[in-house]
Amino acid sequence: MGFVKFSGSVNSIVSNYILNEKIPEGIFNETIVQILPNAKKDSVYFANKQLIKSTEEENKAFRDIEKDEKKKDSEVSFQITQLKFGKHITSQPLQYYYFNRVEGSALNFNANYRSDFSRIRAEANYGYGFADKKQKYELSYSQRFLKDRTLTLSATVFQKLKTANVEYGGLSRFYNTLTSWFDRNDAVDYYYSTGYDFSVSYLPIPQIRLGVSFLQSKETTANKNTDWSIRKPDEFYRVNPPINDAFQRVVGLNLRLDPNKYKFIDFGDGNISRLAQTKYPYLDLGFQYSPKEIGSTYEYRKFRAVISGNNYVNSLINLRYRFGAEYGTGDIPYQSLMYFNTDPGLAGGSMGFKALHYQEFLGDKSYFINIENNFGKFIFGNVPLLKKFDFIAFVNAGKIEISDANYQLSAWKGFSGTDGTFLEIGGGIGRILDIFRVNLAMRLNNINDRRWHVDFTLDNF
């Protein structure tokens, strides 16, 4: 009657395995991805090889992607801080206009070129200050050679208004313009510098980087030329400190020792990229010599050693740290003295001291420790309005000494060494709008007119 039905199947796979066969040499090496030179195929090849045909919707999506990629090669697009002209050329509109107490209102036109894999990088800047009535320019070029881009040659020619002990541009320069306009606070000091520099760096192996450099610069004092401001028209900007006018020719040597292990991606087109597999700290050693024998006004030597690292353990322990020391001998001009890495109020993102005044401590010997830990969402994770933010705690310590000879040599004496070891602690809220960070820092000693300091910066990534 069909109430009972029996069925069954038998399946057998017979394979021929060879156990413990020796693996050919070169299969497991430091290259984790290797694209063969003839691996690039056109759409006709893949159309003939497809086992499952794409749907019309998928084909349309692929065509749209190809159109978008081709469009990017020639279109003009605007991003948050830059204009893009095609794939390789950019310009920064935030630097087209800026203001400071030396140049007054200033214009700066700039263009940047980056080739694929940044093998070639070129930058051009031309500007003019309406208060100091001086033109400025800076042309730089660098090229990376060899298959893994481990040999780099760089050169720059410049005539510019240089910021003392800090480099800024883009968002930082725009931010300084706003604080000058509305709070009469020009955060940095300036001097004129005209000359050129070039450098060569080479990695014989991933763990060692060698470098040599040469700088020639004629450096002169820049004077304050304006007191204009929107909100405080009856007040005055602080004086721009004089420097030791000098002609400097400086030879530099540097060495990086990096114990980390690396793997590589071979793109098959003559380019190789490195990927770090470990997170050990690395050591940077530097030496600078400015001899009178080759025309320098002042003769001095500077030595530098810095250990840096970043270690992620878990969501609560994400450490970044720097330990370093600098030592100088000879007659060091004011503009070349050692200093602590600190943000003078330019919304910068570098790791360093938070509660210091700009150029407060200078000297010919310095020692510093910077440590911070990102606790992630641990503090604010359950707070509705704050759960997207990170909490960062930091501690910084440092000591700067200045010899009597170099203090007397300095053209400006509005600075000092630290009284013992300077200490500060604090915390910050990061990932504000994904890119900003607010810090609250407290001095534990060397207290002058303030113990607490709040600053607004770009986040560290």
Residue ranges and their predicted role:
Residues 26, 78-81, 85-88, 114-121, ...:
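Short loop/turn motifs that connect adjacent beta-strands in outer-membrane beta-barrel proteins
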Residues 113, 122-128, 153-161, 212-218, ...:
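Transmembrane beta-barrel strands of outer-membrane/channel proteins
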